[in-house]
Amino acid sequence: MSITSSMFDSIKSALAADNESSKSGIADILKTEVGNTYTVRLLPFGKDPKKTFFHFYQHGWNSFATGQYTSALSLQTFGERDPIAEERFKILRTGSDEEKEKAKAIMRSEKWLVNIYVVNDPVSPENNGKIKVLRYGKQIHNIIMDAIEGEDSADFGPRIFDLGPNGVNFRVKVEKQGDYPTYVSSKFA
């Protein structure tokens, strides 16, 4: 099979489109800074409400070669074997002391993604009124779960997804605890 000019152009266009869409995906994530409170509304995924939240695992580490932070999606997200986790545990069990120290630097974290409507972004007001993606960890997940099926469910429940006047805002409060941000003071209001 020989490749034609139109086939090559199609391939080139598809790659360019993939490249552009991957750039916009990162730009769509709401960036938060310590010392600020962001007001958002959670958006349900209308086509398939079961897919409102995307739950995933990732590995992250500072590269020993460049010093840059690097992350990789864990295949455990999709219920598959994870070669990064397997190699890390193998090294921790049987590796040299130097290898064990390097393996300890690889951290696995649990995260979620949800679409949000930005009511107030104090750092980037140009985000106000736009749809973004909130990437969050266990602290915010616990607050959301409490509003859905925990102690606060009687007060909030389905209202956390209601964009109308009966809906509630989610106030994402970013504070500093040690060297890391904490979100424990975030709440629905």
What is each model feature region?
Residues 125, 160-166, 182-189:
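Eukaryotic low-complexity intrinsically disordered regions enriched in polar/acidic
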